Amino acid sequence: MSGVYKVSEIQSILQKDVTSEGETAILISLGLMTKEEKPVPAKMAMVASAKANSIIFVSEDGSLSFEAPKETGETSKPGEKKGEKKVEVGVKFPFSAAKVKELIEGKSLTLDQDKIQKVLEEYVKNLPRTAETYKPKEIEIKCFKGVDFSISSLLSSGTKILDAILYSTYKDSAEHNFIFDVKVLSPDFIDSKLLVNNIETGNRAIKAAFCLVYNQGGLPSKTSEERPLSKFVRETIFREKDLKANELCEYLSSADPSLFPSQVFLKISLENLPTEVSSRCKMSIAGNKAMRYALLAQKFDKDEIPVPTEVNPTTSSEYMQKKEKIEKAKKIVDVLCSLASDFQAQVKMHPLSPERSSRKNFTLQLTSAIVTSLSYKGRLDMRKAIEEKKIEAFKRDENIFGRLNALGQPTFPVLTNADADFSELSVEAVKTAYGKK
């Protein structure tokens, strides 16, 4: 993430022979690797030769710059004018709308507020009044008296980010404003550090929300079983190694975050997000694990059927059936790999997408085709690579990773699973599911 990592941290990653999934994501976010995980030597050389205690910044055009920390421990932000006088952060001062506004302007939200509101108005016109939605006055809204309304001003006063987004859209809607409990604040004093931290927390939380929706399929729930947060969310966005999902829920909303219409995140262009976050969202879109399996599998030995030594109608028929099955499996793998850089095609397979294929066991059948395309040696080599690279998500899925039998030998149950049979799945059907002809 721009402005978060020290050169020394990245240099340590670059010195490793094998990087973890989280470390690879960091290198991609900084432009040191391509989305296909290929190194960018010129930028790596820049980092290798930079001062170890410098902070790495990524400009909008992707170029790198390095800022050495000042003696006070603060770093100069790109574009900050020397000698510019600002309200000092970390002190208390008598409340005034003007000073609050000054602090807010220095810490604005990283996402375009107008675009958020436009998308919400277009795609979420009617929040359903069911047991699964917001109750009256469930969303707590705080705002400073006399301060112009914006999502950033709501954040500064302690409103949570998802609540601020909803309020910005539905505050004037008689159909929806029943869900808000609005409190106008006019304190005697303002803690400038707390105000700024509120906005920064909102910024981090909205970035995490995008990652969770795109990468895990939705937002966490306060009432559901605790689910793990990715290393990217914990360490790259929040810089909190032990951050839990229930803690993130508190940062996101005063209500249950799972009630928020998460599909709206798929409608907001990722170009409005910081590069490192948009890159992370595009890296691992929920609903596309078969594509990630295919990208890995293509590196290993493919299966081939030897021509039978004894030719007769029975052996010839069996040979042709097996050959056609393997050839179709290979073509399916090729199609999946060809879509690996097609972001829009992958979004169609997201669990929240209305365009997602309704075919039963579709992902399971794709996985079976991927495993079928490999020789037994190829499957074992892929299994070994999954272990060496510590791809935990793949290890948890025995359909791609396999399992050990009673003799300790790797087997792949997906190949004998009737639900995984892809004989009725055509290559054209796979293309159509991803919006391709």
Curated annotation (Swiss-Prot):
One of its GO terms (molecular function) is RNA binding. One of its GO terms (cellular component) is helical viral capsid. The keyword Lipid metabolism does not apply. Disulfide bonds: none annotated. It is found in: Virion; Host cytoplasm. Keywords: Capsid protein, Helical capsid protein, Host cytoplasm, Ribonucleoprotein, RNA-binding, Viral nucleoprotein, Virion. It comes from the Viruses. Its main location: virion. Encapsidates the genome, protecting it from nucleases. The encapsidated genomic RNA is termed the nucleocapsid (NC) and serves as template for viral transcription and replication. Homomultimerizes to form the nucleocapsid. Binds to viral genomic RNA. Belongs to the ophiovirus nucleocapsid family. This is Nucleoprotein.
